[in-house]
From Swiss-Prot:
HAMAP family on file: Ribosomal_bL12
Domain of life: Bacteria
Alphabetical UniProt keywords: Ribonucleoprotein, Ribosomal protein
GO biological process: translation
Similarity comment text for this entry: Belongs to the bacterial ribosomal protein bL12 family.
Quaternary assembly: Homodimer. Part of the ribosomal stalk of the 50S ribosomal subunit. Forms a multimeric L10(L12)X complex, where L10 forms an elongated spine to which 2 to 4 L12 dimers bind in a sequential fashion. Binds GTP-bound translation factors.
Gene3D superfamilies documented for this protein: 3.30.1390.10, Single helix bin (1.20.5.710)
Entry-linked NCBIfam families: L12
GO cellular component labels: cytosolic large ribosomal subunit
An MF annotation (GO) of this entry: structural constituent of ribosome
Matching Pfam families: Ribosomal_L12, Ribosomal_L12_N
Protein name: Large ribosomal subunit protein bL12
Function: Forms part of the ribosomal stalk which helps the ribosome interact with GTP-bound translation factors. Is thus essential for accurate translation.
Length: 127
């Protein structure tokens, strides 16, 4: 166990360049590639044609404002709070619906943003 602890300590002290070189050396010595499993998994998922598992693995979502509704002022205020945009930018986004309000967020955050927009009187979708 003491040897393993020393190995962990040595690996922790490596710079990024040293770690990359170590990775290359180990790939050559063991005859493996760190990128191969990722490529194989992507090809296998695409070849199977199963759309449902691909959706289950989705981790980033976009919140789309589909309609501002009758109460645009509240929606603009909410868009400003969510995005940090200025008044003019938020107004342009709301009036230009359908537009993405927030992109690449977690499922929970997307649901929260959608609820806030709907509470303000807008219609929104999570994609």
């Amino acid at each position: 166990m003491a040897d393993l602890a020393k190995i962990v300590e040595d690996l922790s002290s490596l710079t990024v360049l040293e770690a990359a070189e170590l990775s290359k050396l180990l790939e050559e010595k063991w005859g493996v590639s760190a990128a191969a499993p990722v490529a194989v998994a992507a090809v296998a998922g695409g070849a199977g044609g199963a759309a449902a598992p691909a959706e289950e693995e989705k981790t980033e979502f976009d919140v789309i404002l589909t309609d501002a509704g009758a109460n645009k002022i509240n929606v603009i205020k909410e868009v400003r709070a969510i995005t940090g945009l200025g008044l003019k930018e938020a107004k342009d986004l709301v009036e230009g619906a359908p537009k993405a309000v927030k992109e690449g967020v977690s499922k929970a955050e997307a649901a929260d943003i959608k609820k806030k927009l709907e509470d303000a009187g807008a219609k929104a979708d999570v994609k």
